[in-house]
Amino acid sequence: MANEKDVELEKLRQARLLEMLKKSKSFEDEALINKPIDVTDATFSETVQSHPLVVIDCWAAWCGPCRMIAPIIEELAREYAGKVVFGKLDVDKNRAVSMQYQIVSIPTLIVFSYGKILDKITGALPKPVLEARITRYL
C-alpha cells in the first residue's frame, strides 16, 4: 500500500515539475523575442497589453519609407530582445486598428507599455533617432 502511494506521489511530482518547466520555457521564449512579430486586428490588444514595452510598426507593402526602416526595426528587435517586443501591423490588412489609432501616415511606430500609448513616431527616421525615442522608456 505504501509503495503504491509512493509511486502515485512520484507521478504527481513529475507532472508538477513538467508543468513548471513548461511555464519557465514559455517565459524564456517571451523574453527572447528577437524579431518583429506579425500583429493583426485580432492579436493587437493582447500583444500590446501583455508586455512592458511594445513597439508596433504600422506599415504597408507599397510604402517605400516603410521598406527603408524595416531593416532598422529588425536590428532593434535583435538588439533589444528581452527588453522590447517589436510588432509589425500591415495597415492595409488590419483596418480596424489603423482607424482606432488614427494611422494616417506611414510608417508610424506606436510605443506601448501594457496597453498604454507612450509615444507615436511618424516617418522614416534614422536608427539613432528611433532608438533614442524607444529606449527612453526602458
Each PLM stretch: what is its role?
Residues 1-55, 61, 71-79, 83, ...:
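Proteins that catalyze or organize thiol-disulfide redox chemistry
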Residues 53, 102-110:
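Structural micro-motif
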Residues 63-66:
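Hydrophobic heptad-repeat coiled-coil signature
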Residues 89-99:
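Structural microenvironment flanking redox-active thiols in thiol-disulfide oxidoreductases
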Residues 92, 104-107, 116:
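Short coil/turn motifs that cap or connect alpha-helices
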